[in-house]
A protein has these predicted regions:
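N-terminal small/glycine-rich loop or linker at the start of catalytic domains
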Residues: 16-24, 112, 210-215
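Conserved, mostly hydrophobic/aromatic
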Residues: 22, 42, 50, 69, ...
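Acidic/histidine-rich catalytic cores of soluble enzymes
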Residues: 138-230
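Active-site acidic/histidine proton-transfer and metal-coordination neighborhood
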Residues: 48-49, 83-172, 258
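N-terminal pre-domain/capping segments
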Residues: 13-104, 172, 273-276
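Acidic-and-aromatic substrate-binding clefts and catalytic sites of carbohydrate-active enzymes
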Residues: 27-33, 52-62, 81-89, 113-117, ...
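Bacterial Sec-dependent N-terminal signal peptides
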Residues: 1-19
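C-terminal helical cap(s) of enzyme catalytic domains, especially alpha/beta-barrels
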Residues: 257-276
Length: 276
């Protein structure tokens, strides 16, 4: 169903062509206890589209896991893969994506020493991502990279994240608004700077007064209900709507996730994105 405002109806949440979803890492503590019950909970929230957290199938066979997804009208549209697997075994990653008929593969982290993310790390990542992305593209699957803030360091006057984006021939990007705001950046300005490069998004808000950094670390308890923190979520979603970002995944890593996600959904439902 495609409408002109955010709605949560019949298990589907859409913002025009953008389909709302959930990043399953949010429920990393719930899944090991009760997979069927957790899927049922997600369904009750009106969520349909999912991005996995690279946690496997929790002891179920692939067929059993897929059956539980189908029973709850859930679909994994994006699968995650560690950097090393993209480098050493991209065929395994692609097979995992095919298990769900997912059209996106996302990598969340580029290995580097401590807080020192360098140009050499960036160049290594470009090689791995472009090689894997070209391989996936032959099967109609898109590789995206999810920055975590450490990419905002500079080399010879250029931000390393700019270097990544400008040389991303066979891969695109997933913006986590928390991890763009945490280093002191404006997510909306980055969306406008690169209007074609961001294909996916994580919607995650940050507690007011939280001090940021550029090392990719934070206290997960600073994750708060969307619209109550220090990030202008409404402006980000409005810009994402203009750009046609396909999936907007709600993510909440805090211990308050079970009541904050429904509150976040209610907030998104309240937005009037047709207002200028």
């Amino acid at each position: 169903m495609v409408l002109t405002v955010v709605i949560f109806q019949s298990g589907v949440a859409t913002v025009n062509a953008q389909e709302m979803g959930l990043q399953l890492y949010s429920l990393r503590n719930e899944f090991p206890k009760d997979v069927p019950g957790t899927f049922a909970k997600i369904k009750s929230w009106g969520i349909t589209n999912l991005e996995d957290g690279n946690d496997g199938t929790f002891g179920y066979t692939q067929e059993e896991y897929n059956a539980m997804l189908a029973e709850n009208n859930l679909k994994i549209v994006s699968v995650s893969a560690p950097f090393e697997e993209l480098r050493d075994s991209p065929e395994t990653v692609l097979e995992r994506a095919k298990n769900y008929d997912a059209k996106y593969i996302v990598c969340f982290w580029i290995p580097h020493k401590g807080d020192d993310f360098t140009l050499e790390d960036t160049e290594k990542a470009l090689t791995v991502f472009n090689n894997a992305g070209e391989y996936f593209a032959k099967d109609g699957v898109t590789l995206v990279y999810h920055p975590h803030g450490y990419e905002f360091g500079s080399y010879n006057g250029e931000l390393l994240i700019d270097h990544l984006i400008k040389n991303s021939e066979y891969f695109d990007f997933e913006m986590d608004v928390y991890w763009f705001a945490h280093p002191g950046e404006d997510p909306v300005e980055w969306l406008r700077k690169y209007p074609k490069e961001f294909k996916l998004m994580h919607l995650k808000d940050c507690q007011k007064g939280t001090k940021g950094n550029k090392n990719g670390s934070s206290n997960v308890e600073t994750n708060v209900t969307l619209g109550t923190g220090q990030i202008d979520i409404a402006a980000v979603v409005a810009e994402a709507k203009k750009m046609g970002i396909e999936y907007l995944f709600v993510e909440d890593e805090s211990s308050k996730v079970l009541w904050q996600i429904p509150e976040s959904i209610e907030y998104l439902e309240s937005l009037d994105l047709d207002k200028d």
